[in-house]
Structure formats: C-alpha cells, structure tokens
C-alpha cells in the first residue's frame, strides 16, 4: 500500500538540479580505466548475464571514479574503479534490489567483513567475495596501514548498518528522519570513498588532522550531500525495488507531504549542507594546514561535483527508460556457486599470490 501510494505520484515528479561553486574535473585515463574495469569484472564473474553486463556498460562506474579522483595515480584509480563496480553490484544483489531479507543475507554480508578482518576468502566464497579480496589486497599494497583501516572501517559499518536498514524495512512504517540519517550515513558507502580522497591527491592525512572535528564535519557533509541528493535522483527506481525503497524523500511523504513536496524538502536539506560545506571548507583551508589536508578537502570537493556530473552526463543508472528492468534483481540474486567456483579457480590462484 505504501509503495502504491508513492508510485501514483511519480509521473508528474520534477527532480531538481544541484550546483556547487567549483569546476568539475576528470582523469584523462577515464576510458582506459573503464575498459579495464569491465575486463576485471568479467574475470571475477561479476557480470552474471549478458543483460547484467549491458546494464553495467551503460552505468559507467569507471567514469565515476575518474570524476571523483581526477588526480589519482593510474594504479590507485584502477583499483578504485574496480571497487566501485564491485560495490554497486554487491549492494544491489545483497541488499537493495532483492527481497528485504533472504536466507543468504547474513552469510553474504559477514563474508565481506571477514575479508577485511582475515584477509582471506571463505570456502566456498559467496558471490563477489574473490573480487572483494582482490580489491582489498591491492589497496593494502597502495595505502598506508592506517589509511587502509579508515577504508576498512567504512566498509565494516556499511555491512553492519545494512542490517539496520533491513530492520527498518521489516517495520510497517519507517523510522523517522533522525534515525534514517544515521543509517544512511553508513549504508551509502560514502565513508570508504571519502577515506581514499587524500591518498588520491597529495597523500594520506595524519590522524591528528583527519580526526579533527571540523575535518570530520566536512567528511560528514560530503556524505550527506551525495547521499541525500541520491535519495532524490534514485527515487523513481527505488520505489520499484522489491525490497529496500525507504529513503529521506519517502519518509517525508510518510509524514504527510506529497512526494513532490518531499523532494523539495530533501533538496533544501542538500543545499543547506552544500552551503555549510563551502563555509567550513573555506575556514579550514584558511588555517595553516598540511598539503595532505588541502588534498583531502580538494578530494571531498571532487567527490561532490564528480558525483553530480556523473549523474547529469554519464550514467544511465537512474534513467526512467530502464526502471522496470533494473529495479528488480531477484532473477540474478543467486548465481550457481558451484559453477562460479570452477570458473574462478584461476582468479583464486592469482589473488592468493598477493597475500
């Protein structure tokens, strides 16, 4: 009933555009990185059917990496692109576009945490686990130890707060905005992404600067801007998903607003975060800070603008034309792992050599 009421209002929905006062950038390696990312996803059996492969091609995750990390070295940029395609696919297949909870949900999510904690894959691995191990081992080689742990902690919180998101969808009505914001801050996947912003520019920020209260506020504002803007941009598709569909817009609608008014309320929140980020970034960079911290703040700006430009110019992930086919992944959610394990034997050998 909740979904049907929302769907009835979608045909006349107007989606606002967001702007920020700094230019976008894009790595000149974008197309090369995109092509290598597709090859890597193929080698790790992430593209489960031709239909799924075509979806990934039109989504352009490599372009997202190139826009959000324009100054990254080629090796780091490649592993980030590979991470992004892995993250979006597993988030869709494990959480968003399947039933709210399945028999495999806990096993899938704990396997992702175990790769971070133990640096090995399970036997047999779940879907995407060997690809995830490969990403983590490459990042361990490229990042300082503490910098990798920032990334890892963000991913652990993604996997664990996914359970809170599932619990929210098992309720007859959603939790309120405050609780949702807490869940969204971690299920968005933005914390692992922003944790790489310094290394992709001028090098890893020391802990004393990274954990400064103002710097963490900037990180949180970046997360909010991207996550809440995405709640608007992905609304039409998410309402058609079989499981997860509640977000900031639908929660506002649950409280009595029309869906259009709920979009405008959410957009106002996004613009307020953008204004707050701009003011605080100016204040922090006016202080005597390290080059690495300047690089981190630049990296946060790249992420905000890069994401907005990716949605506006590159990706078909949220395109109306593909909503019906892309919103429901239940037909893809259980690849035959016995076949997967046989075809992954060579991948297992190559990743184990990196330990």
UniProtKB/Swiss-Prot annotation:
Residues at the site labelled Plays a critical role in the stabilization of intermediate cation: 88
Top-level taxonomy: Eukaryota, Fungi, Dikarya, Ascomycota, Pezizomycotina
UniProt domain comment: The Asp-Asp-Xaa-Xaa-Xaa-Asp (DDXXXD) motif is important for the catalytic activity, presumably through binding to Mg(2+).
Name this polypeptide is given: Sesquiterpene synthase MAA_08668
UniProt xrefs under InterPro entries: Isoprenoid_synthase_dom_sf, Terpene_cyclase-like_2
A Pfam family this chain is assigned to: Terpene_syn_C_2
Keywords: Lyase, Magnesium, Metal-binding
Cofactor: Mg(2+)
UniProt keyword Lipoprotein present: no
GO biological process: isoprenoid biosynthetic process
Binding residue positions for substrate: 184
Organism in which the protein naturally occurs: Metarhizium robertsii (strain ARSEF 23 / ATCC MYA-3075) (Metarhizium anisopliae (strain ARSEF 23))
Motif DDXXXD motif: where in chain: 91-96
UniProt site positions, description: Plays a critical role for substrate recognition: 92
Cofactor-binding details, from the entry: Binds 3 Mg(2+) ions per subunit.
Residues holding Mg(2+) 2: 96
Annotated positions binding Mg(2+) 1: 91, 96
EC number: 4.2.3.-
Family per similarity comment: Belongs to the terpene synthase family.
GO MF annotation, one: metal ion binding
Binding positions for Mg(2+) 3 per the UniProt entry: 230, 234, 238
Function, in words: Terpene synthase that catalyzes the conversion of (2E,6E)-farnesyl diphosphate (FPP) into sesquiterpenes which are important for fungi-environment interactions. Produces a mixture consisting of 9 sesquiterpenes including gamma-cadinene, delta-cadinene, alpha-cadinene, alpha-cadinol, beta-elemene, (E)-beta-caryophyllene, germacrene D, nerolidol and an unidentified oxygen-containing sesquiterpene.
Entry annotated with the keyword DNA-binding: no
């Amino acid at each position: 009933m909740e979904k049907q009421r929302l769907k009835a209002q979608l045909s006349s929905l107007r989606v606002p555009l967001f702007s920020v006062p700094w230019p976008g950038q894009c790595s000149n390696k974008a197309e090369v990185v995109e092509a290598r990312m597709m090859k890597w996803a193929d080698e790790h059996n992430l593209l489960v059917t031709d239909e799924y492969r075509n979806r990934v091609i039109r989504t352009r995750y490599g372009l997202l990496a190139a826009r959000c990390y324009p100054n990254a070295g080629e090796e780091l940029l490649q592993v980030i692109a590979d991470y992004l395609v892995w993250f979006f696919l597993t988030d869709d297949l494990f959480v968003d576009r399947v039933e709210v909870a399945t028999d495999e949900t806990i096993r899938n999510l704990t396997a992702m945490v175990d790769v971070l904690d133990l640096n090995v894959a399970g036997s047999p691995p779940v879907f995407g686990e060997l690809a995830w191990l490969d990403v983590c081992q490459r990042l361990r080689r490229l990042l300082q130890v503490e910098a990798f742990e920032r990334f890892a902690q963000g991913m652990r919180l993604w996997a664990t707060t996914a359970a809170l998101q599932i619990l929210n969808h098992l309720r007859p009505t959603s939790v309120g905005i405050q609780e949702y914001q807490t869940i969204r801050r971690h299920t968005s996947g933005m914390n692992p992404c922003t944790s790489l912003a310094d290394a992709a520019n001028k090098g890893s920020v020391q802990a004393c600067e990274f954990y400064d209260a103002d710097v963490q506020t900037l990180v949180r504002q970046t997360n909010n801007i991207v996550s809440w803007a995405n709640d608007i941009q992905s609304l039409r598709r998410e309402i058609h998903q079989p499981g997860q569909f509640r977000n900031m817009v639908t929660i506002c609608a649950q409280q009595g607003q029309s869906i259009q008014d709920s979009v405008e309320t959410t957009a106002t929140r996004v613009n307020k975060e953008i204004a707050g980020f701009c003011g605080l970034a100016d204040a922090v960079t006016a202080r005597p800070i390290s080059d690495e911290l300047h690089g981190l703040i630049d990296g946060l700006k790249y992420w905000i603008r890069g994401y907005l430009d990716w949605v506006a110019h590159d990706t078909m992930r949220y395109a109306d034309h593909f909503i019906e086919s892309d919103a429901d992944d239940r037909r893809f959610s259980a690849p035959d792992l016995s076949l997967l394990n046989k075809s992954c034997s060579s991948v297992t050998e190559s990743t184990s050599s990196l330990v």
